Amino acid sequence: MDHNMHVNAPSLHHWGYAAGPGVVMPGATATTPQSHWVPPPQSHHSAHSNHSHGHSQGHSHGIGSLKRTLSESDCDDLYSEESSKEQISPSEPGSCQLMSRKKRRGVIEKKRRDRINSSLTELKRLVPSAYEKQGSAKLEKAEILQLTVEHLKSLQSKTLDSLSYDPQRVAMDYHIIGFRECAAEVARYLVTIEGMDIQDPLRLRLMSHLQYFVQQRELSAKSCASPGGWSPAAPSSSGYQPNCAAAPYQSYAAPANPGAYVSSYPTLSASPSQQAQQLGGRTSVSRTSGSAVTESLPSHDLHSDSSSQQQQQQQQQQQQQQQHQQQQHQQQQQRTQTTPQPTQQQHYTHDHSAVHSEQQVPTYIELTNSNRPAAIGSDSLSYSAAPQYPVSGLPGQDYNNSSVLQYATPNGAKPYRPWGAEMAY
């Protein structure tokens, strides 16, 4: 019995090992129907092996259950982290920070999109081609950007010389435009206001002169259009062409006195004294202002006119000396009346004293004195308004001395008016 049990023990042990955990061995139940059966000592090894096998199986089962428990906890932890990212509960401390970060990110992104859209709308309004296409169809963002690039390229091609921009040239262009407008207004004034014919020689000469002048200014402006013609340090108030050569018509400098541009020849309706005053006044103005107005009246013409007038005055003086020999008492009375008058006449001759000393031309002044001498007859009073001529009847006095002037009117004779002789010159 013991031997059989001992022999059957390995088989039972082998069968029980192959059976797996939790399976009741049928041999054990068959041989030991009673639950209180005590195995023999020989079976101690098998029992020990069974116990060790069961313990190993239980240990392995415990390890498997432990591993399963750890894996399930890891999955639960991962799921909880993912769920916390998706569904943030306000009870957690880091949930508020995550929520605020998400909100800030959304607000920043919205602002960025709004800024891009507003800039594209502004470009669509500013670019001409995009503005023209705006009414026909809705423009996409890429199309707006493409039209903007094309517009910038066209601007760059048109303004390649933007670095060599010359403000002086622009000012000169405006000046030429204004000059042409003024010339057109002058032509209109001569026809409509002055009643001058369109084919009038004076009008034609004036317009041709203005056209030639503006052409010269345009040529001078083009000559100054070189890159080195303008420097930023040049003052803007010095004129349009500070660095350029003067045009041929720029020699007509503007006079300091605005009344210096007067007629270069005396009017025929003026008296000889007024003509001499006009000539002397123009010469003094031209010398004091330093302008080139006297070029229109050469110096030899002035000397020839003054010499001819001097000869005429000498003839007049000779005739008047013969007449004054008959009226000696009238000359004495007139001398007594005119001697206290140098201070009254001084302001007439003060302006032209320098010119008279240079040209040696006597100046004749028309005086209308209210205090007339009583000895002058009624016949001579009718000619008191006419210009009178001085007479150097006193010995030791020069006729060029303008401080003492003698005036006399012959009885019954008109004063000498050499209009024909002066018109011949």
UniProtKB/Swiss-Prot annotation:
Residues 272-297, 305-346 have a biased composition (Low complexity). Residues 100-155 form the bHLH domain. PROSITE patterns: BHLH, ORANGE. GO terms for molecular function: DNA binding; protein dimerization activity; RNA polymerase II cis-regulatory region sequence-specific DNA binding. It comes from the Eukaryota. A motif (YRPW motif) lies at residues 416-419. Keywords: Developmental protein, DNA-binding, Notch signaling pathway, Nucleus, Repressor, Transcription, Transcription regulation. It holds the Pfam family Hairy_orange. Residues 86-98 have a biased composition (Polar residues). Residues 174-210 form the Orange domain. Residues 45-58 have a biased composition (Basic residues). One of its GO terms (biological process) is regulation of neurogenesis. This is Hairy/enhancer-of-split related with YRPW motif protein. It comes from Drosophila melanogaster.
